[in-house]
């Protein structure tokens, strides 16, 4: 079917949160047998990705975390996750593992929950094929500035994949990108350009009660518009205004491009 329609596969996603076995975690589960199943599942996903000529497996360790104090030993959990992801990454170097962070849900507190911690984790694996998926909505939920997160991850060389959506910073609503945080999105698009990001940008949106096809159409329309505005920005002019510390001159300039 892919060949018939001239399509490629952006990523293979490994879900280690939906099945009952992952209720109390996957790569950080206290039982070694469950952790082994998580590692084996990652290796299988990497094999499937290679078969599809797809360079990346994405995974969000969202059941790896806690709901209550004293529920886990954090040092053990972090070490288990490192060991498991490192083993999977060493299994085949031709496929990247891109790990997605999130502050909470389904766990009250996810173990890998912000850009800095996720980048550090990726570095600690000591594997070049381990990196980070930056979900714009998750960055908002973690009270990050998405452009800052993109710039930071881009500079570390660990920005492997991007999800676009939007929310009010109170929950991961997966709304059409730019409909709530337009300023942040324009700055985010500029940051991706500045770090030279050339990977996939995936629409991670949820239709709620609206027509799914229209939601996807609007996602593409809004993202095209956002990147068009970002492309209009004279980076030399912007940098000079930033040196002069005139915030409202900057905002007026960006507003003139809308």
Task: Please provide the spans of the model-predicted regions.
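Transmembrane beta-strand segments of Gram-negative outer membrane beta-barrel proteins
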Residues: 6-8, 206
């Amino acid at each position: 079917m892919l060949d018939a329609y001239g399509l490629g596969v952006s990523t293979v996603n490994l879900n280690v949160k939906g099945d009952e076995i992952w209720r109390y975690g996957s790569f950080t589960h206290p039982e070694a047998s469950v952790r082994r199943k998580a590692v084996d599942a990652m290796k299988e996903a990497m094999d499937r990705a290679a078969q599809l000529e797809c360079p990346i497996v994405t995974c969000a360790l969202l059941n790896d975390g806690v709901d209550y104090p004293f529920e886990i030993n954090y040092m053990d959990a972090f070490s288990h996750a490192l060991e498991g992801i490192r083993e999977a990454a060493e299994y085949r170097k031709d496929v990247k593992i891109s790990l997605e962070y999130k502050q909470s849900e389904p766990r009250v507190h996810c173990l890998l929950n912000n850009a800095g911690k996720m980048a550090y984790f990726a570095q600690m694996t000591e594997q070049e094929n381990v990196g980070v998926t930056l979900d714009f909505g998750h960055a908002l939920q973690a009270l990050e500035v998405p452009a800052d997160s993109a710039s930071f991850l881009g500079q570390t060389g660990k920005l492997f994949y991007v999800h676009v959506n939007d929310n009010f910073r109170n929950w991961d609503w997966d709304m059409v990108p730019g409909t709530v945080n337009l300023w942040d999105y324009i700055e985010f698009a500029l940051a991706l350009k500045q770090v030279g990001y050339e990977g996939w940008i995936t629409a991670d949106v949820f239709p709620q009660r609206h027509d799914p096809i229209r939601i996807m159409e609007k996602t593409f329309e809004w993202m095209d518009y956002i990147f068009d505005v970002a492309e209009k920005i004279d980076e030399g002019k912007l940098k000079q205004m930033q040196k002069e510390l005139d915030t409202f001159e900057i905002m007026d300039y960006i507003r003139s491009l809308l």
